[in-house]
Amino acid sequence: MLERIKGCFTESIQTQIAAAEALPDAISCAAMALVQSLLNGNKILCCGNGTSAANAQHFAASMINRFETERPSLPAIALNADNVVLTAITNDRLHDEVYAKQVRALGQAGDVLLAISTRGNSRDIVKAVEAAVTRDMTIVALTGYDGGELAGLLGQLDVEIRIPSHRGARVQELHMLTVNCLCDLIDNTLFPHQND
């Protein structure tokens, strides 16, 4: 059992090292897209399922409240956080549309959709991205494995941050770290002297 525990830590560290080599440019581009949207008076919509939903909510909470330092609130909405809306849509047997309907209702040109999917194949996330495209929104996709269907939907101005792993747990761990990096970059770009 102890060796298995050490193996989990070792694999996580190795994935973090691989991500540190592969992802800085993509994370930087994503942060700049998010910052530019906020500077233009737009908002960030985010969504995910399971652990990805928790990461989406963490991102939105860090924007609305704060990340590590006090600063003005920033507009972000976790589309998976409103149980009444979610159950109303799924009650009508529209499971695949649970986020797309919200994107069509709330999304505007210039907004960003932060779509988080471990494999990139969740139908409701794919439909949300398709809806965001019709609204002229920028998409930041956090994926893993081979990027899945999401990777094929992204345009030139969109950003995919694909965790270099084929293990769901490692992808999810690095998604959380990536969300924290994005929050840190947004805060330090928009409010560079808040930490002084």
From Swiss-Prot:
Record-linked SUPFAM superfamilies = SIS domain
Keyword Cytoplasm carried by entry: no
Keywords, alphabetical: DNA replication
List, alphabetically, the GO terms of the cellular component aspect: DnaA-DiaA complex
Residues of the SIS domain: 34-196
List, alphabetically, the CDD domains matched: SIS_GmhA
The UniProt entry's GO biological process terms, in alphabetical order, are: carbohydrate derivative metabolic process; DNA replication; positive regulation of DNA-templated DNA replication initiation
InterPro entries on file: DiaA, GmhA/DiaA, SIS_dom, SIS_dom_sf, SIS_GmhA/DiaA_subfam
A GO molecular function assigned to this protein is: carbohydrate derivative binding
Note the Gene3D superfamilies from the entry: Glucose-6-phosphate isomerase like protein, domain 1
Q: How does it assemble?
A: Homotetramer; dimer of dimers.
Q: Which HAMAP family match?
A: SIS_DiaA
Record-stated family: Belongs to the SIS family. DiaA subfamily.
- Give the function comment from the record: Required for the timely initiation of chromosomal replication via direct interactions with the DnaA initiator protein.
Q: What is this protein called?
A: DnaA initiator-associating protein DiaA
Lineage, uppermost ranks: Bacteria, Pseudomonadati, Pseudomonadota, Gammaproteobacteria, Enterobacterales
